[in-house]
């Protein structure tokens, strides 16, 4: 704590002081609320809604609404909010992060701002880390909301669209970040507005906010369809890298989590694949496959980064140890790991829609979060999300003793000492929770305990199903639980009978995590609600953190002391050195996330433009003027491209090419000739082409009817936009993969990505116009009463958020035309190259 904080109190102290008068006001309303009958208490909700509709702000209603919620909670749940919980609720309503220690009742705290903000009638979302917690909290707290006249819903995996829509239309909706994010993406892929399930994003409270907004920030949500590329090259690249020798043919950079070929390795690749220059742009695909094969074989570790389960590769969440079901590494890394492990290599998928959690959650009008550990990441929360962190005081003083770290020379010495400590503690009956950083290490420690005949339970990704059950018993007398990192987070560890008498729950950390926050979370499992407890971390100089980021100074101290394998040192200097190593890694990880956000912000602005225009089309905006403007733009830009600034000698050739080009898109074959137009000015040519195209379009509309034509325009525009957007996502991804090399040319990669990405976006918009006009002029429909289903079918449009791409072909009510026959439209081209071409 700095001198300023000692004199004036910390930022959180000052904020809590500021909120105290509001809490006093809530307290003073208590007796008044106690006098109300159940029905009168419920009527308060409708009174608040009426006052809100008349212009009273939620801030003004806060003391009264919180007092109503507090009284209802006492009656329905038998739980009355403490003053500290009222402070936490106020912080959450203000759109901030409330740091509340484990066991301080975060679930109950959230009911206050959730109730108040639900009064606005715009929907409140409560985000949890898994389906189990979402369902539990909805059922538990739903009793309170329903008593107060509000509706609740829960979004879990496997619901139908109608069930999802119903849940989102409730006043309060619980669910996981994945479900909310995927629903947003799917809503922006539908053909009919009635198929959307979400309402506009209004107010959101994220439980375990650090886990979702920071730990998962680097993992984008992706909806994908099957790709078409062969998987053979992954197997060939894997076969090649398995023969390479470390240091000689490749090197590993543990800090960057990457592996690279040496000059000798490059020569080996050129020889093996029969190429002259490995670095040549033509060999980019090969470079990519070899790079991913190197990373898969020599950087990614089985049972730490991923597991092989049912002949498939399952990603292990590095922070929780849980399996990330349904998630795959992007950029071909997943396929490279599949090749390494000898399981079936799945085809690389095509991205249909994608968004990062960073950008999804920044779309809410108001965002708030709660967690036991946020202060260490305060800078990131403020810079990325505009959220500040307020530490809420605990209801009872923390009595847990956090002991200094013990540092050993070797990992073996460390594990021997841990086993010894567990055995000694077990004799007293004190329960022990041991935190490890990987499945591999938890199982290694388990094997050591088995050899000594010590009974214990192991909790990691392999036993995900029993997670909550095992964790809930971890505080019972004599229990020993080994857990991978934060597995079981969200489930309280309550102390069993007689445990306080033997010192409460003992926490043993088997090594320091890269992030201090994860260490604090482990410590926080003990000492809830003022209970006694103990915690200590055991560290060796062979641990990843110490080996990669630890200081040489610490190593030299250990060497000078001449420590034996079983001896440990314990000092403030050592702890400081370890914290500095962690700060270094945290800073490094923050920079990576910030850089990725810089790239994603470019895509985000483009996504917003596309989704906004898409929404306007869905909402029924009259598209007639837009289509006419597209026709004009396509003709004008084509004339400019062919006839602008050219030599007189080339004029007739370019004019002929222009006519052919526009005949392919919209003009009737043979209507215009070079002879007829060669004396006309560019402006005159443009005018004639536009007039002709408009005339043809008008005739088409008169034939099918205006209402049917507007519907056809809507479906075709949506599908062309979707197709081009999907291709653009791929193109931007490829651009990002190679953009890092710009640094060698003294260019800022982010700036280069922004400029080139912007040019690619403009090109995509232009191509959308061209394809939309082409399909509108080529589509053949019969005149009859418009039917949305039929129009969608005829233009090849699919319903809903289908993750597979849809092939669209114009429907013709004529005898079937062979793909190699001349096209009946009169263009002179083969049917497959003209009206029979596929839209996607």
UniProtKB/Swiss-Prot annotation:
Cofactor binding annotation: May bind 1 zinc ion per subunit.
Keyword vocabulary terms for this entry: ATP-binding, Cell membrane, Cytoplasm, Membrane, Metal-binding, Nucleotide-binding, Protein transport, Translocase, Translocation, Transport, Zinc
Gene3D superfamilies cross-referenced by the UniProt entry: Helical scaffold and wing domains of SecA, P-loop containing nucleotide triphosphate hydrolases, SecA, preprotein cross-linking domain
Positions annotated to bind Zn(2+): 823, 825, 834-835
A molecular function GO annotation: protein-exporting ATPase activity
InterPro entries, per database record: Helicase_ATP-bd (IPR014001), Helicase_C-like (IPR001650), P-loop_NTPase (IPR027417), SEC_C_motif (IPR004027), SecA (IPR000185), SecA_CS (IPR020937), SecA_DEAD (IPR011115), SecA_motor_DEAD (IPR014018)
Membrane topology: Peripheral membrane protein
Stretches the record annotates as Disordered: 787-822
Biological processes annotated in GO: intracellular protein transmembrane transport; protein import; protein targeting; protein transport by the Sec complex
EC number: 7.4.2.8
Subcellular location: Cell membrane; Cytoplasm
Keyword Cytoplasm: yes
Catalytic reactions of this protein: ATP + H2O + cellular proteinSide 1 = ADP + phosphate + cellular proteinSide 2
Matching CDD domains: DEXDc_SecA, SF2_C_secA
Taxonomic superkingdom: Bacteria
Cofactor annotation: Zn(2+)
Biased composition (Basic and acidic residues): 802-819
Assembly mode: Monomer and homodimer. Part of the essential Sec protein translocation apparatus which comprises SecA, SecYEG and auxiliary proteins SecDF. Other proteins may also be involved.
PANTHER family: CHLOROPLAST PROTEIN-TRANSPORTING ATPASE (PTHR30612:SF0), SECA INNER MEMBRANE COMPONENT OF SEC PROTEIN SECRETION SYSTEM (PTHR30612)
Function noted in UniProt: Part of the Sec protein translocase complex. Interacts with the SecYEG preprotein conducting channel. Has a central role in coupling the hydrolysis of ATP to the transfer of proteins into and across the cell membrane, serving as an ATP-driven molecular motor driving the stepwise translocation of polypeptide chains across the membrane.
Protein name: Protein translocase subunit SecA
Species annotation: Clostridium perfringens (strain ATCC 13124 / DSM 756 / JCM 1290 / NCIMB 6125 / NCTC 8237 / Type A)
Lineage of producing organism: Bacteria, Bacillati, Bacillota, Clostridia, Eubacteriales
Name of the gene: secA
């Amino acid at each position: 704590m700095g001198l300023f904080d000692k004199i004036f109190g910390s930022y959180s102290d000052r904020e809590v002081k500021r909120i105290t008068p509001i809490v006093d006001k809530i307290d003073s309303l208590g007796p008044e609320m106690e006098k109300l009958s159940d029905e009168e208490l419920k009527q308060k909700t409708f009174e608040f809604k009426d006052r809100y509709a008349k212009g009273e702000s939620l801030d003004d209603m806060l003391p009264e609404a919180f007092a109503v919620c507090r009284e209802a909670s006492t009656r329905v749940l038998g739980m009355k909010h403490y003053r500290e919980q009222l402070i936490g609720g106020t912080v959450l309503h203000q759109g901030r992060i409330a740091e509340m220690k484990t066991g301080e009742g975060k679930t109950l705290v959230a009911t206050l701002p959730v109730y108040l903000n639900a009064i606005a009638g715009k929907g409140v979302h409560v985000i949890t880390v898994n389906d189990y917690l979402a369902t539990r909290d909805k059922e538990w707290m739903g009793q309170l909301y329903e008593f107060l006249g509000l509706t609740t819903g829960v979004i879990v995996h496997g619901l139908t669209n109608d069930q999802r829509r119903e849940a989102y239309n409730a006043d309060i909706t619980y669910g996981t970040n994945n479900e909310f994010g995927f629903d947003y993406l799917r809503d922006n892929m539908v053909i009919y507005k009635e198929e959307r399930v979400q309402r506009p994003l209004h107010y959101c409270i994220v439980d375990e906010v650090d886990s979702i907004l920071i730990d998962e920030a680097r993992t984008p949500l992706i909806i994908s369809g099957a790709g078409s590329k062969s998987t053979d090259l992954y197997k060939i690249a894997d076969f090649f890298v398995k023969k390479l020798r470390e240091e000689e043919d490749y090197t590993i950079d543990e800090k960057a989590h990457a592996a690279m070929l040496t000059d000798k390795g490059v020569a080996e690749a050129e020889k093996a694949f029969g190429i002259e220059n490995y670095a040549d742009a033509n060999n980019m695909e090969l470079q990519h496959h070899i790079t991913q094969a190197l990373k898969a074989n020599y950087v990614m570790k089985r049972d730490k980064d991923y597991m092989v389960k049912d002949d498939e590769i399952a990603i292990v969440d590095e922070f929780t140890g849980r399996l990330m079901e349904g998630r795959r590494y992007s950029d071909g890394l997943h396929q490279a790991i599949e090749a390494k492990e000898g399981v079936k290599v799945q085809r690389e998928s095509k991205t249909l829609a994608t968004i990062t959690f960073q950008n999804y959650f920044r779309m809410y009008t108001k965002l708030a979060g709660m967690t036991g550990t946020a202060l260490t990441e305060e800078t990131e929360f403020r810079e990325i999300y505009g959220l500040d962190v307020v530490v809420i005081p605990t209801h009872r003083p923390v009595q847990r003793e956090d002991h200094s770290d013990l540092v050993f020379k070797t990992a073996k010495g460390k594990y021997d000492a841990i086993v010894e400590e567990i055995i000694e503690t077990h004799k007293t009956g004190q329960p022990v929770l041991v935190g490890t950083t990987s499945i591999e290490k938890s199982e290694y420690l388990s094997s050591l305990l088995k050899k000594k005949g010590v009974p214990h339970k192991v909790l990691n990704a392999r036993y995900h199903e029993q997670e909550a059950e095992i964790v809930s018993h971890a505080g019972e007398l004599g229990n020993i639980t080994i857990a991978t990192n934060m597995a079981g987070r969200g489930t309280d560890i309550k102390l069993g009978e007689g445990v306080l008498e033997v010192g409460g729950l003992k926490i043993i950390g088997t090594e320091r995590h890269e992030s201090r926050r994860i260490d604090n979370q482990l410590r926080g499992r003990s000492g809830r609600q003022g209970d006694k407890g103990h915690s200590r971390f055991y560290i060796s100089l062979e641990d990843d953190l110490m080996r990669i980021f630890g200081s040489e100074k610490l190593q030299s101290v250990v060497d000078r002391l001449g420590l034996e394998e079983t001896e440990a040192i314990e000092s403030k200097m050592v702890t400081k050195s370890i914290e500095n190593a962690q700060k270094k890694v945290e800073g490094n990880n923050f920079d990576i996330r910030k850089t990725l956000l810089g790239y994603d912000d470019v895509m985000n602005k483009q996504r917003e433009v596309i989704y906004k225009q898409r929404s306007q089309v869905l909402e029924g905006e009259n598209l007639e003027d837009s289509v006419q403007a597209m026709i004009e733009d396509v003709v004008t830009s084509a004339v400019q491209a062919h006839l602008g600034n050219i030599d007189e000698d080339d004029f007739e050739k370019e004019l002929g090419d222009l006519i052919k080009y526009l005949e392919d898109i919209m003009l009737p074959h043979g209507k215009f000739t070079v002879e007829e137009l060669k004396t006309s000015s560019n402006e005159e040519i443009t005018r004639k082409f536009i007039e002709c195209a408009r005339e043809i379009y008008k005739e088409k509309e008169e034939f099918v009817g205006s209402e049917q034509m507007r519907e056809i325009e809507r479906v075709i525009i949506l599908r062309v936009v979707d197709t081009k957007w999907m291709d653009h996502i791929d193109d931007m991804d490829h651009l990002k993969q190679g953009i890092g090399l710009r640094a060698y040319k003294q260019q800022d990669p982010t700036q280069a990505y922004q400029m080139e990405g912007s040019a690619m976006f403009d090109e995509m918009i232009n191509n959308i116009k061209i394809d939309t006009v082409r399909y509108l002029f080529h589509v053949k429909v019969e005149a009859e009463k418009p039917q949305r289903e039929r129009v969608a079918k005829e233009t090849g449009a699919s319903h809903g958020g289908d993750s597979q791409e849809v092939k669209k072909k114009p429907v013709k009510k004529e005898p079937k035309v062979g793909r190699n026959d001349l096209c009946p439209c009169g263009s002179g081209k083969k049917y497959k190259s003209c009206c029979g071409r596929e839209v996607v």
